[in-house]
């Protein structure tokens, strides 16, 4: 497995930052809902909104990724998610959180399918590369939780703004 491959570096970097930001945003949504409603039911509902995408649309999203192409599927959903988060920052609405969580879950599902489909273009050693991706993913989940913990001390809105900025980062990796 050649980790010096430029595409490997870009994919792994994008995965790390995207997952880190998404983790912080998910925790931000949960915190926002609980602080606004003080309802455990509503807090759980925002998590369900992100998971529904995989259940309802997962089987069909692979077709969308194939039709649109891998590069489109790895860049456009991140940028769209960034704009969606910025809209939420300016339009502070409780019910909008559920729609945004669903849309971001939709974009993340497309992105996940595209990333996994792109791996054979980078390496023939799929087992090692998948293990590397899982390790990066877990490290990003921990880093995202830490990022959230630090930023929440200043502002919940800042969590969403920082993730929106992070979501625009795939444009820097386009060749």
Outline where the language-model segments fall.
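Short amphipathic helix-loop junctions that connect adjacent transmembrane helices
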Residues: 24-41
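Helix-breaking motifs and short loop linkers at transmembrane-helix boundaries and internal kinks
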Residues: 37, 69, 91-92
């Amino acid at each position: 497995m050649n980790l010096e491959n430029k595409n490997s570096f870009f994919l792994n970097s994008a995965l790390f930052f995207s997952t880190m930001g998404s983790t912080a945003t998910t925790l931000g949504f949960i915190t926002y809902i609980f602080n606004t409603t003080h309802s455990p039911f509503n807090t759980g509902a925002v998590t369900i909104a992100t998971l529904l995408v995989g259940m309802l649309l997962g089987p069909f999203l692979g077709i969308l990724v194939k039709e649109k192409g891998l590069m489109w599927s790895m860049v456009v959903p991140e940028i769209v998610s960034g704009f969606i988060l910025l809209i939420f920052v300016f339009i502070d609405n409780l019910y909008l959180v559920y729609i945004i969580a669903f849309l971001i879950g939709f974009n993340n599902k497309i992105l996940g399918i595209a990333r996994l489909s792109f791996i054979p273009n980078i390496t023939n050693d799929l087992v090692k590369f998948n293990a590397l991706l899982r390790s990066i993913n877990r490290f990003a989940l921990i880093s995202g939780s830490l990022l959230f913990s630090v930023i929440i001390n200043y502002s919940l809105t800042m969590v969403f703004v920082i993730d929106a900025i992070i979501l625009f980062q795939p444009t820097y990796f386009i060749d």
